[in-house]
Amino acid sequence: MKLVCSQAELSSSLQLVSRAVAARPTHPVLANVLLTADAGTGRLSLTGFDLSLGIQTSLGASVATSGAITLPARLFGEIVSRMPSDSPITLSCEDGSEQVELTSVSGSYQMRGMPADDFPELPLAQAGTPIKLDPDVLIKGLRATLFASSGDEAKQLLTGVHLGLDQNGLECAATDGHRLAVLRLQNASSSEADLDVTVPARSLRELERLLSSRGGSDAVSLFCDRGQVVFQWADQVLTSRSLDGTYPNYRQLIPESFGRQLQVDRKGLLSALERVAVLADQHNNVVKLTSDPAAGQLSISADAQDVGSGSEAIGAQVSGDAIQIAFNVRYVLEGLKAMGSEQVQLQCNAPTTPVVLAPQDDSSFTYLVMPVQIRQ
């Protein structure tokens, strides 16, 4: 294998695929990145794969001799990133050898790799017709829901985001058992096929990161087959296992009607919560929200035993009887930050039943939070 490529492009590509390299590999080759040079296409392909998440990208290169080898991702990335950006890099490896030489204007480095045949095959599962997704719509769906997925591996299915596609659009949903975020998106796909799959949050965080930094507006092709999902666009591929099982019927958790509704300024509520959260963090992360229909106010308070207490009040349009309800402040803050509207609606029935927060001017996003029971 012998090729010449741009230092900047190689360094950038290595940073992308290294995010799929195993931090604690079960086999030495999983700590490596696979390099595949093709003289026919004039491309250098890089692949990182930890047996769960795989990322593949390619860059243009002047390939004199085709070939493939794996190199230690961390060491290779650190060497390349420190090479002069204004000088091309030459990579060369003799047939049958595991020694790779990197050469630039600043000098040369030798690295020992492992055979490409030792690297596990990336499960691309690209059979059938792909589902075409609008990348901007997909990014919006992921940003609105990823934060609500569970970090508890014991809740296997809840550690992912559920993606559902039908003739009405794409629906992204995530829940950790304490809160639920759902975003319904129209005109998400040019395909007529339906989709019903749950993908690990870690994989989708990397997908959102990659799509956000992409150039161009190519549609994302989604393949789903035999426990694998593959997202492909431009010269990049992300593959992930899907999560087994039937995702909870989250729609039945959302109340059909509400006896109490409040409308408040989102940024005002967010700021007040962040200030009161300083005290809530000292104890149990619980804040109490109390509505006052007569005064047209919503008060936010926290009481940290043996530390102190604090409260603030903001203006609110209140309908229904007064109510006091308690939440984990982090859940409410994260939900409000996922919204972009000026006004937010808070809808509830009783201090112990689910509360729904939604943007005043956007019915596509629903955020449900379970309250915390407090002793009076």
Features from the language model and the residues they span:
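Structural preference for solvent-exposed beta-strand-turn elements
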Residues: M1-Q376
